[in-house]
Structure formats: structure tokens, C-alpha cells
Regions:
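Residue-level recognition of single "structural anchor" positions
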Residues: 1-185
Length: 185
């Protein structure tokens, strides 16, 4: 039990699976199995407990990552698995408590937006205010999942022009956000 607690503690603290394997003197397969088991337990606990949430304001967003290789590099990658490429984590967060009410991992499509919003609708109780970024797929998803039971707005960020955008110093830096625009739906 002590070793299991140590493995999970190190993973939660951000250690890599290989470093956890070395520190705890266990195989990397043991660490991977513990990670999968813990993930499945957390999924079941979240699904059971995060129901009937009374939330006033919910913020939905999506964040990009990749599995194995970026989508543009998958064809050139050696032995890329079927699920290789871009991955989007969709989130619905209570703006006040920061409770992660709903989440979904998928692509950046209208179907993924729909899955997130329908799951969210099944977890909240009462009328809510939903805010998203300007991704158009949210429009149909919010209307389909909530109908008239939600106040909905998009919050679009406005970015300034940057003369150094193409320079090596700016290649991986985000553009400067100079404001935002609210769009009530």
C-alpha cells in the first residue's frame, strides 16, 4: 500500500512515469497500470458524485495537445498508432468554485462540442449562464443541450498586430491580447 501511495503521489506532483519507476524501484509497467487504475477510479467517482450541481456561471473551453505526433507529422512518423495526432480536451468549469463539472477528450469538431454540452446538461440543476470562446460549434451544442434553460454568451479575445510575429524570438510566443468582445447569444 505504501508503494502505491508513493507512486500516485509522485505522479500527481508531475513526475514522469520513468522517474517514478526509478524512485519507487518498480517497473514502468507497474506505474502505467497504477495510472490507468487510478484514472478509471477517478472517472467513476466523478461520474457518480458530480450530479445535480447548482451552478450559476459555467465556462467552457477546449485545449489542444497531441498524442504521439502532431497531426501534420503523423504520416511521416514511424509506427504511429491509429489514435496519433491532435487531441482536444474539452472542459466545463464552474466559474465560481472551479469545479470541473464536465470534460471530454476528442477532436475539435461540432460533435465533440455536442458531447461535452449534453453531458454538462445532465450534470447541472437549474438555469445556468454559459460562456465560451468564439468557436462556432458551441452555438448548436448549447442550444441542443439546454434549449431555453441557459443564458449563453461568447467571449472573443482580440489580439493586436505584432511586427515581430515572424521573428525567431516570437515563433512560439502567443500574440498579445489587447482586449475582448462579448457576444450575447
Amino acid at each position: 500500500l505504501e508503494t502505491r501511495v508513493q507512486i500516485l503521489t509522485l505522479l500527481v506532483e508531475g513526475n514522469s512515469m520513468r522517474s517514478v519507476s526509478r524512485i519507487c524501484d518498480v517497473s514502468i509497467n507497474t506505474v502505467a497500470k497504477m495510472l490507468v487504475d487510478a484514472g478509471e477510479a477517478c472517472l467513476a467517482l466523478h461520474d457518480e458524485k458530480v450530479r445535480g450541481v447548482k451552478s450559476e456561471r459555467i465556462q467552457c473551453d477546449e485545449i489542444w495537445s497531441f498524442c504521439y505526433a502532431k497531426a501534420k507529422n503523423v504520416k511521416a512518423a514511424k509506427a504511429a498508432p491509429d489514435h496519433a495526432g491532435d487531441v482536444w480536451t474539452w472542459t466545463a468549469l464552474d466559474a465560481d468554485t472551479k469545479l470541473m463539472i464536465s470534460y471530454f477528450v476528442g477532436d475539435r469538431s461540432g460533435e465533440s462540442a455536442r458531447v461535452l454540452l449534453y453531458d454538462l446538461a445532465g450534470r447541472v440543476d437549474g438555469r445556468v449562464q454559459i460562456t465560451t470562446d468564439g468557436f462556432a460549434s458551441y452555438l448548436r451544442a448549447v442550444e441542443g443541450a439546454f434549449g431555453a434553460d441557459a443564458d449563453y454568451a461568447m467571449l472573443e479575445k482580440v489580439y493586436g498586430a505584432d511586427k515581430l510575429t515572424s521573428s525567431p524570438e516570437r515563433k512560439y510566443s502567443p500574440a498579445e491580447c489587447v482586449g475582448s468582445r462579448k457576444i450575447a447569444i
